[in-house]
């Protein structure tokens, strides 16, 4: 009888598909589906980002400083009331236009144009730098105002200050010069003219 029971149990086990070997509560897993090789998909190339151009800085307008200063210097040298040999402080040329001008050598051209005449004795750049340093200003500091220029002129014992500005539209700038008496701050001569571009 034991043989018979074992035979029945074995047959039942074979017929049930071996589900009896699994622990309780588990279900047999599905056989894996057959895999097919994946076809490579075409990846679209990304479009490059839109690059906005960097704006160019405004162009500096070049200036013929010597040609611009010449007529005004002629007027200045013939101005009445200026004693020959007077000490003159030339303030740096100020750009007060609505744009950028090549101002790098403007003050130097102005000093050079005035240096050779006997009407004025120029304050040297070394004296000017030393006076600026004693007042706590940088050597390349542009004074920017008439009162600062007169204060500096007193420091170097100058009798006159030449204050020069370029103003107006950068496409057609105007040059203005003022000769001031240091003692009183009075403008004793002024002249205006176009800037030669």
Swiss-Prot record:
The Pro residues compositionally biased stretches are 29-57
* Main location per the UniProt record: membrane
Per the record, its GO cellular-component terms are: periplasmic side of cell outer membrane
Topological category with respect to the lipid bilayer:
Lipid-anchor
- Annotated signal sequence is 1-17
Keywords, in A-Z order: Cell outer membrane, Cell shape, Lipoprotein, Membrane, Palmitate, Peptidoglycan synthesis, Signal
The lipid modification S-diacylglycerol cysteine is placed on 18
* Location in the cell: Cell outer membrane
Named from the GO MF annotations, one term is:
enzyme regulator activity
> Which GO terms of type biological process are on file?
peptidoglycan biosynthetic process; regulation of cell shape
What ranges does the record give for the region Disordered, renumbered to this chain? 23-57
Matching InterPro entries, A to Z?
A: LpoB
In this record, residues modified by a lipid of the kind N-palmitoyl cysteine are 18
Taken from the record, one Pfam family name reads LpoB
Function recorded in the entry? Regulator of peptidoglycan synthesis that is essential for the function of penicillin-binding protein 1B (PBP1b).
Q: What family is reported?
A: Belongs to the LpoB family.
- What is its quaternary makeup? Interacts with PBP1b.
Q: What is this protein called?
A: Penicillin-binding protein activator LpoB
Q: Identify the species of origin.
A: Edwardsiella piscicida
* Source organism phylogeny: Bacteria, Pseudomonadati, Pseudomonadota, Gammaproteobacteria, Enterobacterales
Q: Which gene encodes it?
A: lpoB
């Amino acid at each position: 009888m034991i043989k018979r029971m074992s035979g029945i149990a074995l047959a039942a086990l074979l017929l049930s598909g071996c589900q009896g070997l699994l622990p309780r509560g588990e279900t047999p897993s599905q056989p894996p589906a057959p895999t097919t090789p994946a076809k490579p998909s075409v990846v679209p190339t990304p479009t490059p980002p839109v690059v906005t151009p960097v704006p160019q800085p405004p162009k500096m307008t070049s200036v013929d400083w010597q040609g611009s200063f010449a007529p005004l210097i002629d007027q200045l040298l013939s101005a009445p009331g200026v004693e020959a040999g007077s000490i003159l402080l030339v303030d740096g040329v100020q750009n007060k236009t609505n744009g950028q001008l090549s101002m790098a050598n403007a003050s130097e051209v102005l000093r050079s144009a005035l240096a050779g005449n006997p009407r004025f004795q120029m304050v040297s750049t070394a004296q000017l730098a030393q006076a600026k340093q004693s007042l706590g200003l940088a050597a390349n500091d542009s004074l920017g105002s008439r009162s600062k220029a007169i204060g500096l002129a007193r420091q170097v014992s100058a009798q006159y200050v030449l204050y020069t500005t370029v103003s107006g539209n950068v496409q057609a700038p105007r040059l203005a010069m003022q000769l001031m008496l240091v003692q009183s701050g009075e403008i004793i001569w002024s002249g205006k003219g176009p800037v030669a571009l």
